[in-house]
C-alpha cells in the first residue's frame, strides 16, 4: 500500500474559496523558466480538493494528495493543514 501512495502527486496551495460542502478550491503556484527569455515566471492553477471534515478555512495553506476521481473536476483530497490563515 505504501508503494501505491509513493506515486501519487502531492500539491501545496492556499485555500481561495470554500463554496460547497466538503469541497475547497486551492491556488497552486509554480515557478518556471521562460523558454525564450530565460526569466523565472510564476504560473498558477486552481484545484478542487475534497475536505471530508470541513476543517479548512479560506486563507489556510494545505497539502493535498491525489486520489481517485470524486467528481468531474475533483481528484485530490486533503492530506494536512500546513498553516492556518486569516479569513478575509
Curated annotation (Swiss-Prot):
GO BP terms in the entry: translation
GO CC field: cytosolic small ribosomal subunit
Molecular function via GO: rRNA binding; structural constituent of ribosome
Family matches, as InterPro entries: NA-bd_OB-fold, Ribosomal_uS17, Ribosomal_uS17_bact/chlr, Ribosomal_uS17_CS
One Pfam assignment: Ribosomal_S17
Keyword list, A-Z: Ribonucleoprotein, Ribosomal protein, RNA-binding, rRNA-binding
Described function: One of the primary rRNA binding proteins, it binds specifically to the 5'-end of 16S ribosomal RNA.
Family, similarity comment: Belongs to the universal ribosomal protein uS17 family.
Subunit and interaction comment: Part of the 30S ribosomal subunit.
Alphabetical list of HAMAP family matching this protein: Ribosomal_uS17_B
Designated name of the protein: Small ribosomal subunit protein uS17
Taxonomic source organism: Wolinella succinogenes (strain ATCC 29543 / DSM 1740 / CCUG 13145 / JCM 31913 / LMG 7466 / NCTC 11488 / FDC 602W) (Vibrio succinogenes)
Gene: rpsQ
